[in-house]
C-alpha cells in the first residue's frame, strides 16, 4: 500500500497529476485544492496517498495535507459517496468549510459539489454531524449539546484499517475485526500483526 509519494510533478491536468518517483510515473487523482497547491511542473512535490485496489485497477488518490486525506477517508464511509464524489466535495469545500456546512446543516453549500444532490447532502449532514469533532479543523464546528463522538482509529490501527478497506472489506467489519485483534494482542501490536489478524478474522 502506498501512503506517500515524493518525487517530481511532471504534469498537472484536470483532476489528476503525474508524479515521477525514481523513473516511475504515478497517475494520482486529486481535489482541485490539492492540485492548486502543487508547484508548476516540473518541480519537486509530495502527496499523501490513499490506494484503492480493485480487480481491474489500482487507483491512487493524493492529498496535499493530512486533513484533506482524513476527510476523504471519512466521506467515503458514507453510502453513495465514492472516491470521485469525495474529491468533488473537497474541491468545492476545503475541510474547514465542509465541517462548517455539515454543522450548520447547510445543504446548499454541500450541493455545490458535482454529483451531490439534496438527498445525499442530507445524509452527509445526518451521519457526519456528530463525527466531525474528531476530524482536523472539525472541533470548532460541533453544535453545543451534542455527544462527543468516538475517535476514529489512529496510528497503526488506522493504517491497518485502510489496508483492509483497500482490499475490499467493508469498513465497519474491518474495524470490528481489528479492534478484536488489538484487544488480544495489546496496544503494542505491530502493523503487520494487526493486518494478518484482521484478515484471519474476516476470513471466518
UniProtKB/Swiss-Prot annotation:
It comes from the Bacteria. Residues 144-154 are annotated as: Flexible linker. It is found in: Cytoplasm. GO terms for biological process: DNA recombination; DNA repair. Disulfide bonds: none annotated. GO terms for cellular component: cytoplasm; Holliday junction helicase complex; Holliday junction resolvase complex. SUPFAM superfamilies: DNA helicase RuvA subunit, C-terminal domain (SSF46929), Nucleic acid-binding proteins (SSF50249), RuvA domain 2-like (SSF47781). Residues 1-64 are annotated as: Domain I. Residues 154-204 are annotated as: Domain III. Coiled coil: none annotated. Homotetramer. Forms an RuvA(8)-RuvB(12)-Holliday junction (HJ) complex. HJ DNA is sandwiched between 2 RuvA tetramers; dsDNA enters through RuvA and exits via RuvB. An RuvB hexamer assembles on each DNA strand where it exits the tetramer. Each RuvB hexamer is contacted by two RuvA subunits (via domain III) on 2 adjacent RuvB subunits; this complex drives branch migration. In the full resolvosome a probable DNA-RuvA(4)-RuvB(12)-RuvC(2) complex forms which resolves the HJ. The RuvA-RuvB-RuvC complex processes Holliday junction (HJ) DNA during genetic recombination and DNA repair, while the RuvA-RuvB complex plays an important role in the rescue of blocked DNA replication forks via replication fork reversal (RFR). RuvA specifically binds to HJ cruciform DNA, conferring on it an open structure. The RuvB hexamer acts as an ATP-dependent pump, pulling dsDNA into and through the RuvAB complex. HJ branch migration allows RuvC to scan DNA until it finds its consensus sequence, where it cleaves and resolves the cruciform DNA. This is Holliday junction branch migration complex subunit RuvA. It comes from Acidiphilium cryptum (strain JF-5). The lineage of its organism: Bacteria, Pseudomonadati, Pseudomonadota, Alphaproteobacteria, Acetobacterales.
Amino acid at each position: 500500500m502506498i501512503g506517500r509519494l515524493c518525487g517530481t510533478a511532471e504534469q498537472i491536468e484536470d483532476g489528476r497529476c503525474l508524479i515521477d518517483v525514481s523513473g516511475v510515473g504515478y497517475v494520482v487523482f486529486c481535489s482541485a485544492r490539492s492540485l492548486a497547491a502543487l508547484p508548476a511542473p516540473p518541480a519537486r512535490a509530495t502527496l499523501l496517498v490513499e490506494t484503492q485496489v480493485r480487480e481491474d485497477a489500482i487507483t491512487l488518490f493524493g492529498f496535499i495535507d493530512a486533513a484533506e486525506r482524513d476527510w476523504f477517508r471519512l466521506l467515503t464511509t458514507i453510502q453513495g459517496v465514492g472516491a470521485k464524489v469525495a474529491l468533488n466535495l473537497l474541491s468545492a469545500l476545503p475541510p474547514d468549510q465542509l465541517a462548517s456546512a455539515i454543522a450548520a446543516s447547510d445543504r446548499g453549500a454541500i450541493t455545490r459539489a458535482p454529483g451531490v444532490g439534496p438527498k445525499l447532502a442530507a445524509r452527509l449532514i445526518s451521519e457526519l454531524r456528530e463525527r466531525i469533532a474528531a476530524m482536523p479543523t472539525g472541533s470548532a464546528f460541533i453544535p453545543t449539546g451534542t455527544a462527543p463522538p468516538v475517535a476514529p482509529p489512529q496510528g497503526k490501527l488506522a493504517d491497518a484499517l485502510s489496508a483492509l478497506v483497500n482490499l475490499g472489506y467493508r469498513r465497519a467489519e474491518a474495524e470490528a475485526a481489528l479492534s478484536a485483534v488489538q484487544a488480544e494482542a495489546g496496544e503494542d501490536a505491530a502493523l503487520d500483526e494487526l493486518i494478518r489478524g484482521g484478515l484471519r478474522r474476516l476470513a471466518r
